């Protein structure tokens, strides 16, 4: 039973269609990345500090406020909605498991170690997953991927050769050099005005029938 719960914890780090296979992948050494199908990777998140991601409670409140109808809908919306649903369910399972461990382990030190590991390590993975999918739904997947790459390049650049401020996701589309969304409107050169003829034109007299 404990091995089953351990597999549940590990599977929560992959809330996609591959989640059911992750426990087997862990046993047989399969390389399964929960972000791969979305164009990202776990390595891209290694550049972001743990305190960068909001708390699980704040992320759940954001998901509920913005996408509750879509998350509760029985219809398929987008892969990000599906992954977000699974991440929320996995967090609920983790909290249930943490309560079970707290009620069944008699050794307080061992209980604290398990609960702390769940909150620190698995909690961080859940926060990363929630943040990624909520951001993809809010800003667009391409913008989020561009932000992760831009931040990785910025943090790896020596301070003397990089801008003082790190990229910000909410302002990324306005500050990036290469814009992927739309094109700037083409400026039209003014056409030369036509020269009016010097001869005066006769004004046509309008008949009463033609007036509206």
Curated annotation (Swiss-Prot):
GO terms for molecular function: DNA binding; RNA binding; structural molecule activity. Keywords: Disulfide bond, Host nucleus, Host-virus interaction, Repeat, Secreted, Signal, Viral immunoevasion. It is found in: Secreted; Host nucleus. Residues 165-212 are annotated as: Disordered. One of its GO terms (biological process) is microtubule-dependent intracellular transport of viral material towards nucleus. Phosphorylated. Cleaved by host furin. Residues 184-212 form a propeptide. One of its GO terms (cellular component) is host cell nucleus. Sequence repeats lie at residues 184-190, 191-198, 199-206. Residues 178-205 have a biased composition (Basic residues). Gene3D superfamilies: Viral capsid, core domain supefamily, Hepatitis B virus. Residues 184-206 are annotated as: 3 X 8 AA repeats of S-P-R-R-R-R-S-Q. Pfam families: Hep_core_N (PF08290), Hepatitis_core (PF00906). The keyword Repeat applies. Homodimerizes. Belongs to the orthohepadnavirus precore antigen family. May regulate immune response to the intracellular capsid in acting as a T-cell tolerogen, by having an immunoregulatory effect which prevents destruction of infected cells by cytotoxic T-cells. This immune regulation may predispose to chronicity during perinatal infections and prevent severe liver injury during adult infections. This is External core antigen. It comes from Hepatitis B virus genotype F2 subtype adw4q (isolate Senegal/9203) (HBV-F).
